[in-house]
């Protein structure tokens, strides 16, 4: 609560070095809004500078999460493109795609600006993974507002998406708005949105068949089947890849995997040299 407070880069880099020495392979940078990191200390946001410093520590993966769209700058995108160990993964909570609802939510962005951000990222990093979250059933959301959201999702074909129904909280600005929707309508809209994204997810996954990905092994199903993640997926919230291997793999290993099968959300493959 209260204003954003940033730790200075030096202290964060020192902590990161200790984590690296302790054997950490994936470093995750997260805050209420990582895109404004350093604004209170340096007079302007400096997430790009922090990421550049972290990239020198030689983690296998560095992932930054929860950056508001208005804070994603060309400088940040360029740093991600520059370093192989910074995951080309952008977690951008867009919340909605109707300008009217975005305004009611007090968001500092618009549908066109959201599209421009996605286009900027993809023009610089064509294979970037873009993750977002949307809220359906916000007070005052009309049928046409929801259709705008559906249209945006179908147009942009975002790689990863989480969605939630609006949940009323007392004494919040949204609670005082008119036009609260019944739970049945909110649930119907959520189900439709998720079905649209499910089709998109499977379509994007099928394009990965035959490609090779660096995979972090995280669990074992049986003697020859493991569960892992590519850099396209954050832990717990995204998809997994099932890895078939005749050789024994250890949890925490990085291996190269050829994608053989694609499902609605997950993938399946085998070791490159299996």
Predicted segments with their positions:
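Canonical Radical SAM [4Fe-4S] cluster-binding loop centered on the CxxxCxxC motif
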Residues: 1-10
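Conserved, mostly hydrophobic/aromatic
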Residues: 12, 29, 64, 92, ...
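Conserved SAM/AdoMet-binding glycine-rich loop
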Residues: 20-146, 154
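Short acidic/polar active-site loop segments enriched in Thr and Asp
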Residues: 25, 60, 159, 164, ...
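Short, ordered loop/turn segments at secondary-structure junctions
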Residues: 32-34, 166, 246
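Radical SAM enzyme [4Fe-4S]-AdoMet core and its adjacent flexible, acidic
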Residues: 38-55, 105, 168-199
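Terminal RNA-binding accessory module
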Residues: 176-274
